[in-house]
Amino acid sequence: MLEKFNSFMEKWMAFVTPACLLTGVLFPDIAKHGVPYVTYAFAFMTFIGALKSRFRDVADVFKRPLPLILMLLILLVLGPVAACGLGHLLFPGNMNYITGMVLEFSVPAAVISLMWVSIYNGNSPLSLSLVVIDTILAPFLIPAVLKLLVGSSVKMDTVGMMKELVFMIALPAVLAMCLNEVSHGKVMETWPKKLAPFSKMCLIFVVTSNSSKVSPYMKHLNGERLEVAAAILVLAAGGYAIGWIIAILTRQNKAATVSMIYGSGMRNISAGAVIAGAYFPAETLFPVMIGTLFQQILAAFYGSMMRRVQTGQQEREKEHGVSA
């Protein structure tokens, strides 16, 4: 039963995620009750995602660091600069929107990307390393980026972010890798498949709960806000695409390509929302929160695209094999 559910979810993820988003937006009073438990769901997804990793696998990432470095450059440099440029081009008189756009693409890589990487058989140690490093750097780099690009001064709760990092990423990841070491790889071979359905359930829960936060903004949409939403959609879609293109140009293998697509495209929007709500006017929060609507849909879309490309490549390889 659980295996059938897992197969169904993986096949129809491009439709399941929009349905979850719609549910959260339409029924926010119900969906919002899940928000306090989202952190625990993230921790569980990190644990499941890390079950495919060993300590030596993470060490190997740093022996061949090019994919990791490229993703960090996309996340830390290209994303914020592109957001700032497009913001000034489209909304030259509205610094709140520009600040929100820059903030949206300055926050670290998303923990939930580990689940998507796991679904499409990406390089889990590479993705785990990216999430950990980017989240550690975030309390120092986000204020610097905002100061440099939009002139805003922000003091972040570094200790609070570090505690969240430890609970959501470090502890579950270390626990999973320790289980792999103690079991001599047996856990790695059996647990990910058994726990995969529960990871999908967590995704449904997280997407539905978090999308409840967007509901107030969706009820008061106007022409300018639709333009902001379109700009965020273009930038978000571009992040995935750039990761894919750079992976092809640098001739990365299939697993690293999957990790680069999701590592370059998915952001920890919750962190951005906390910063925007604490330090900026309410208008700044809109570009950050509207990204919630697109992130999971784009993740499912690019996953579907990857499957089609890989299926096409396999069919061509078979044809060449037969003709040879």
Q: Model-predicted segments: where are they?
A:
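Alpha-helical transmembrane segments of multi-pass small-molecule/ion transporters
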Residues: 1-324
